[in-house]
Amino acid sequence: MAVPKKRTSTSKKRIRKNVWKKKGYWAALKAFSLAKSLSTGNSKSFFVRQINLE
């Protein structure tokens, strides 16, 4: 089994954690932006069928 030889420093650990958090933040921002454009009808990447309730 692979075992690390030395302990990871706190600063390196914090940097890696922040990179990981930032990826999630950007993914959420992109998803929110897409949802907003779909709800307003300004989406250029999705074709949403309009349903008329009459």
UniProtKB/Swiss-Prot annotation:
Compartment(s) where it occurs, according to its Swiss-Prot or TrEMBL record: Plastid, Chloroplast
Superkingdom, natural source: Eukaryota
GO terms of biological process kind: translation
InterPro entries (UniProt xref): Ribosomal_bL32, Ribosomal_bL32_plant/cyanobact, Ribosomal_zn-bd
Any one GO molecular-function label of the UniProt entry: structural constituent of ribosome
Keywords annotated in UniProt: Chloroplast, Plastid, Ribonucleoprotein, Ribosomal protein
A single Gene Ontology CC term: large ribosomal subunit
PANTHER family noted in UniProt: 50S RIBOSOMAL PROTEIN L32, CHLOROPLASTIC, LARGE RIBOSOMAL SUBUNIT PROTEIN BL32C
Family of this protein: Belongs to the bacterial ribosomal protein bL32 family.
The protein, known as: Large ribosomal subunit protein bL32c
Source organism of this protein record: Gossypium hirsutum (Upland cotton)
Taxonomic path: Eukaryota, Viridiplantae, Streptophyta, Embryophyta, Tracheophyta
Gene expressing this chain: rpl32
